[in-house]
Amino acid sequence: MKKISVLIIDDSALIRKLLTEIINARPDMEVIGAAPDPIVAREMIRTLNPDVLTLDVEMPKMDGLEFLEKLMRLRPMPVVMVSTLTERGSEVTFRALELGAVDFVAKPKMDIRNSLEAYTDEITGKIRTASTARIHRLEPVASNGAASGSIVQMPRHHGISTEKLIIIGASTGGTEAIKDVLIHLPPDCPGILITQHMPEGFTRSFAERLDRLCKIRVKEAEGGERVLPGHAYLAPGHSHLLLKKSGANYVTELSQTDPVNRHRPSVDVLFQSAAHCAGKNAVGVILTGMGKDGAAGMLDMHHAGAYNLAQDETSCVVFGMPKEAITLGAVDEIVPLQDMARRILARLVGAGKQAVRV
């Protein structure tokens, strides 16, 4: 079997050496080159034709974002970003995902050798996922990063109970998919709970970014909040997010119990809590991502009476989690990403023609 070929682009010689050691220790992948900056990397990409790049966010000679944008316009290929856990680092990372990077890993700040080696499974797993990801040529985007398209309006002749909820789970490619859904939702939509696989330290910045772009309010969940219409609550990178009932109200709860499906936060944990607390009042949404997290929980939601939607294969970066949920029989409707917001709202009011019925 052909090994996944990886080109490392990082201005730190130590990081290049450590990443090379980690990647070459895996039997299914190998480093075929390492460049200190994008200028050197350009020629190596032409001559070596790697399957995946790892790209440092901030480098001399050419900014990582500038290089990524040119790459995705001229020669689209799978890229995993290596990012610092700073406010600027996280903002640059989310811009990189907008430009077409498949995923990112955090660059450790202290005791680099030990902490980076602890990331071995994460780094190699994301390289493996990136090698199979669906990559699109970058098209021109708005300078503010906002997605195109208008807000989907709630039909005025249909009332939506305040009991209704939207429950979303995603992984690889999910930051852009979640943005593309939320940015089209009106401020009077039902409350939303979201689990996106993301390292601790990035979820707050992600929530703040969504809050700036969307008509609804978006925040990192703190636990104990009442779930309000027009508000979305994002699982923090260190905790599972659960839906609970407190009297007549829905509230959020955080848990630091063991990872589920190797993830904390886990989509299964959120979906299972929604099945228990919300039942038929929930609409479940599973978006792009590698693995099976969320499939079993979505089946629980289905059995509890929820209506579930899955992102279709064509619009997914990685058609893993949606495929697993579909295979289990947990999904009621398969929807292209560009139609997801409309279909969610149509289902909540019981209106509209179904897209692809499973």
Swiss-Prot record:
It comes from the Bacteria. SMART domains: REC. CDD domains: CheB_Rec, REC_CheB-like. The active site is at S171, H197, D293. Residues 159-351 form the CheB-type methylesterase domain. Phosphorylated by CheA. Phosphorylation of the N-terminal regulatory domain activates the methylesterase activity. Pfam families: CheB_methylest, Response_reg. The keyword Coiled coil does not apply. Its main location: cytoplasm. This is Protein-glutamate methylesterase/protein-glutamine glutaminase. It comes from Nitrosomonas europaea (strain ATCC 19718 / CIP 103999 / KCTC 2705 / NBRC 14298).
